[in-house]
């Protein structure tokens, strides 16, 4: 919704208490202001200097004596804000207006109205701005760029919060050895170790396997497929676990340590064979 307020030619007071809220909404929202008064439409800088006159008490008046319409027009476009209003019917601008090259400059030099409290100044240096008026259409519509201090601050992106590491519950437990699993399918495959069941048969050599993944790896020995090559040498392997073991020969990593003599090994099978020497 837009608020359009026009200047009156009958010297109507724009700053009575009934119009205070719509006026402040218009200031903060940067709505369009239509100046129907010929003294406040400001078609050019030359005519503006002729149309505006500053009286001795600081109130700017037009040539026809309409002070409130012109004062309201420049309060709206000058970026002025109210801090203390003791009188809504009598308000003095108390500032000088200068027009240079189409730019309206407001300089804080005159005195404020006597009804304004001394300990709360109506204007400060931060309120005095210089606003460049763009080309004014024939209808008298004025435009003003938003004051930088009134623009909404940019919201900083929220930091990405990674979920906390949680231990996966393992509700499926083997009744033979007590080993627990997170999925029932893993427990079923594990039970075949105890029962010796091997339902997966190789169609080439009829070799049975307890898990389907073991059958897939075995069939690569017949096809010659080796999808896991080593980046350090020219060797390739049929499964990823064999490649991991091979890479330790290049890096020298030996994660398996004997608890008796502290001897290290690259593979767990080598550690098991070594432990038999201590018995």
From Swiss-Prot:
GO terms for molecular function: DNA-binding transcription activator activity, RNA polymerase II-specific; RNA polymerase II cis-regulatory region sequence-specific DNA binding; RNA polymerase II transcription regulatory region sequence-specific DNA binding; sequence-specific DNA binding; zinc ion binding. It comes from the Eukaryota. It is found in: Nucleus. Changing residue 261 to Y: In ot63; leads to a loss of expression of lim-6 and cgy-7 in left ASE chemosensory neurons. It comes from Caenorhabditis elegans. A zinc finger (C2H2-type) spans 172-194, 200-222, 228-250, 256-278. This is Transcription factor che-1. GO terms for cellular component: nucleus. Expressed in ASE chemosensory neurons and in some other neurons. Keywords: Activator, Chemotaxis, DNA-binding, Metal-binding, Nucleus, Repeat, Transcription, Transcription regulation, Zinc, Zinc-finger. Its main location: nucleus. One of its GO terms (biological process) is response to salt.
């Amino acid at each position: 919704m837009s608020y359009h307020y026009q200047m009156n030619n009958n010297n109507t007071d724009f700053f009575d208490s009934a119009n205070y809220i719509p006026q402040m909404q218009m200031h903060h929202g940067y709505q369009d202001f239509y100046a129907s008064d010929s003294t406040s439409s400001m078609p050019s800088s030359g005519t503006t200097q002729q149309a505006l006159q500053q009286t001795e008490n600081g109130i700017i008046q037009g040539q026809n004596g309409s002070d409130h319409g012109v004062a309201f027009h420049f309060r709206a476009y000058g970026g002025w804000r109210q801090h203390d209003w003791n009188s809504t019917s009598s308000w003095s601008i108390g500032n000088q207006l200068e027009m240079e090259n189409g730019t309206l400059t407001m300089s804080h030099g005159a005195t404020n109205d006597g009804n304004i409290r001394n300990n709360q100044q109506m204007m400060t240096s931060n309120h005095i701005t210089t606003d460049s008026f763009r080309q004014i259409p024939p209808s008298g519509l004025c435009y003003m760029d938003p004051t930088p201090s009134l623009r909404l601050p940019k919201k900083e992106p929220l930091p990405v919060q990674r979920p906390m590491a949680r231990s996966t519950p393992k509700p499926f437990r083997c009744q033979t050895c007590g080993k627990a699993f997170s999925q029932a399918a893993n427990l079923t495959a594990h039970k075949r170790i105890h029962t010796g069941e091997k339902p997966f048969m190789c169609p080439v050599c009829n070799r049975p396997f307890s898990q389907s993944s073991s059958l897939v790896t075995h069939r690569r020995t017949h096809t010659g497929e080796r999808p896991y090559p080593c980046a350090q040498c020219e060797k390739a392997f049929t499964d990823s676990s064999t490649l991991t073991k091979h890479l330790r020969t290049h890096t020298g990593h030996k994660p398996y340590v004997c608890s008796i003599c502290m001897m290290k090994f690259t593979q767990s099978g080598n550690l098991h064979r070594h432990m038999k020497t201590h018995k």
